[in-house]
Amino acid sequence: MPKTAYVRTKPHLNIGTMGHVDHGKTTLTAAITKVLAERGSGTFVPFDRIDRAPEEAARGITINIAHVEYETDTRHYAHVDMPGHADYVKNMVTGAAQLDGAILVVSALDGIMPQTAEHVLLARQVGVDHIVVALNKADAGDEELTDLVELEVRELLTAHGYGGDSVPVVRVSGLKALEGDPRWTAAIDALLDAVDTYVPMPERYVDAPFLLPVENVLTITGRGTVVTGAVERGTIRVGDRVDVLGASVETVVTGLETFGKPMEEAQAGDNVALLLRGVPRDAVRRGHIVAAPGSVVPSRRFSARVYVLSTREGGRTTPVATGYRPQFYIRTADVVGDVDLGETAVARPGDTVTMTVSLGRDVPLEPGLGFAIREGGRTVGAGTVTTVED
């Protein structure tokens, strides 16, 4: 049976759920797909289909990023169910980097937890400018307690530059909505309306040279190697030539799909799978970049403005100095780098500093690009590239 082609009839946005483990992100994602499926604009994806890796089912946590799609009256969304567990924040960094907006899920029973704050900080660092809050499990909570949690969340968002007073906060129950309770399915509608109206259509750089950071690599027997990810900028069509930076390969795109539907052309903001001609599976990996030929020159050295997380925000307890060698999470790549603080010499937790970084390998860099700094499984800093050195 031939696949139905993807037809672009509505503007496309990338949205995601984030928040602390067990606050109900995946349940809420399933509830959104169920409510919209009943409206006739999507396919219901049950909870156990979203949380799909075996180790997740055992531990009840989302590790790999799961994508679902749905439509509201005015938009088409690709929805990323974001990891909630601290060990997996590195996935969050690569997942959040391609989001146009996010739904912050906070349990009305528990309030703000450590990962709630870390996810908000990361969202800010990787350029997610608009957040809508879902106060989940609102069916089980005391109203006054829920009011306090809402206040707490607004203060957290304000502290991270999100204008907490104007952020929509919607009280929901993912579980009750899945059970079909009309009060709570209406709350899901209200949440989606808030996303539709509060998260603006981003400026898409469709005319810039094509660039896609590789999130995943698959092999289709008899057809070749497939890379998946979100198009950062530009447009790509079947038959276009591309460079795979990191693999040092030039090739041709022989197939293009989004959510299993073939498409003629993908553009900035689309989540896509690209079939690459004659590229061995082991030549390409997550962190590589697929780009228009000759459009990007990878570099190792750059200068950046970096915020070193305070101890209270889960950062280091001691300062960093020149010679520090953490992991730099840049787009979907993670690379070790040497830090030179110049005359500053040391940076204490809570400081914002300028640093020069020498990476362990060449990475496509450009001014304005955001990144996270991690060590020992936690985020310790976040910054923006200011200049790239040859």
UniProtKB/Swiss-Prot annotation:
**One Pfam family per UniProt:** GTP_EFTU_D2
Q: Might you give the EC number(s) for this enzyme? A: 3.6.5.3
Q: Which residues bind GTP?
A: 19-26, 81-85, 136-139
InterPro entries the UniProt entry points to? EF-Tu_GTP-bd, EF-Tu_GTPase, EFTu-like_2, G_TR_CS, P-loop_NTPase, Small_GTP-bd, T_Tr_GTP-bd_dom, Transl_B-barrel_sf
Q: Where do the annotations place Mg(2+) binding?
A: 26
Name the major location: cytoplasm
Top enzyme class, one word, equals hydrolase
* Domain tr-type G per the UniProt entry, residue ranges: 10-203
Q: Where is this region: G3?
A: 81-84
How is the quaternary structure described?
Monomer.
The molecule here is called Elongation factor Tu 2
Organism, by scientific name, is Streptomyces avermitilis (strain ATCC 31267 / DSM 46492 / JCM 5070 / NBRC 14893 / NCIMB 12804 / NRRL 8165 / MA-4680)
